[in-house]
Amino acid sequence: MDYPEPIAKLINSYTKLPGIGPKTATRLAFYTLGMQEDDVVDFSKSLLSAKKDLTFCRICGNITENSVNPCAICQDKSRDQSTVFVVENSRDVMAMENTRDYYGLYHVLNGVISPSAGTGPEDINLPSLIRRLSDHQEINEVIVGTNANAEGEATAMYLARLLKPAGIKVTRLAHGLAVGSDIDYADQLTLIKAVQGRTEL
């Protein structure tokens, strides 16, 4: 038996989210149907507001409000202007900020190099990093914080080959992070140790 069209559309919408298969999407759809109408309206307003009121920082690529661009981190002159922490996504920035142990700048790639997925250096936020390093000679270290998987390693090695000839120190997070792990899932102590024990590429 097919679901009524409104439910089928809702299920289909949930399946577009990462990690949500048809069964979970169905559970979420029926849970949504059981919510109070006010809660559903608030939920939909939150989705629309996040999409409409947020953008990417024009300097680092992190998520920021439309009214705050560059983002608060890029505007903060008290931060160490000589170090840039390169991460895959904005969740990684939040994970590092929550450690309260890193006080430099960030650059969000919004992806990784992945030949199998057809994603090359030009498809991620890499050209802006090169421009940024060229425009800001005070930056003398790039910490590569891509995840410890094949794509993250490929991206790290590409960055090292690209930046080292320019005289920029390129370091990699220490492997207190398990191979295959994502930064935003690591606990704060592991992240602190990974930054402190970073090694040069």
UniProtKB/Swiss-Prot annotation:
It holds the Pfam family RecR_C. This is Recombination protein RecR. The keyword Nucleus does not apply. Residues 82-178 form the Toprim domain. The keyword Repeat does not apply. Keywords: DNA damage, DNA recombination, DNA repair, Metal-binding, Zinc, Zinc-finger. Belongs to the RecR family. PROSITE patterns: TOPRIM. A zinc finger (C4-type) spans 57-74. One of its GO terms (molecular function) is DNA binding. GO terms for biological process: DNA recombination; DNA repair. SUPFAM superfamilies: Recombination protein RecR. It comes from the Bacteria. May play a role in DNA repair. It seems to be involved in an RecBC-independent recombinational process of DNA repair. It may act with RecF and RecO. It comes from Leuconostoc citreum (strain KM20).
